Amino acid sequence: MNYVLKVPVAICGVALGFAALGNLFKASFEGFYLACGIISIALLALYTLKFMVSTKTVLRELSDPIGLSVSATYPMAVMLISVYMKADIGDAAQLFWFAGIALHILCIALFTSRYIAKFDWENVHASWFIVYVGIVVASVTAPAFNFETSVGTVAFWFGFICLVVLLIVVSIKYVNMGRCLILLSRSLVFMQLQQAYVLQDMYSP
């Protein structure tokens, strides 16, 4: 059980990766497609078990902007896996798909209330794209459930608009960070040169 408690939230991203990778081989290599689906489900089940065993541990992981944003890969993976499940459980898979969408919307709402309503440049990271642009997975999977003209369209445009906005915001953050690092490195070099001159004066005859 201790092993389960050590499972990081990033494992949800790995599950998402396997689910997406399997979809690429759905038509050409069904065996690989199914294997990726099984691995993805197993990884999500592992993190779900961690949540059930120690909810406080999971909530503590989600208490910072990076942890919370990475957790959005969980509902994204659920949406993709629901397409896998449709072949076996039929229309019931649609319930999992809607559950994934609802959970992702919850992530967006929670993240917005914490880090957009109380905006701070220190909390801006590239992982913000996962939260706001990740909902586009609903658009990609919508045709499997005949919702491409409704849910799919809304999810696509929401994600696209967020992508444009975040490209600007995140770029500003990292450009400014790069400038700060350059200034810091120059300051350190200047300080080292000063120390070198001082030492030279001290030990020169």
Stretch-by-stretch model annotation:
Residues M1-A20, T55-L80, W97-G100, Y115-V140, ...:
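Juxtamembrane helix-loop boundaries in multi-pass membrane proteins
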Residues M1-T48, V53:
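N-terminal signal-anchor module of multipass membrane proteins
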Residues N23-G31, V83-L95, V140-T153, D201-P205:
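Helix-coil boundary and interhelical linker segments in multi-pass alpha-helical membrane proteins
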Residues N23-L24, Y47-S54, C107, F111-R114, ...:
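A cross-family "folded-core" feature that marks the main globular domain of proteins
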Residues F32-A45, G90-I105, S150-V164:
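Structural signature of hydrophobic alpha-helical transmembrane segments
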Residues F51-V58, V83-Q94, F111-A117:
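Transmembrane alpha-helix boundary signature
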Residues Y132-V175:
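Loop-centered beta-sheet repeat module
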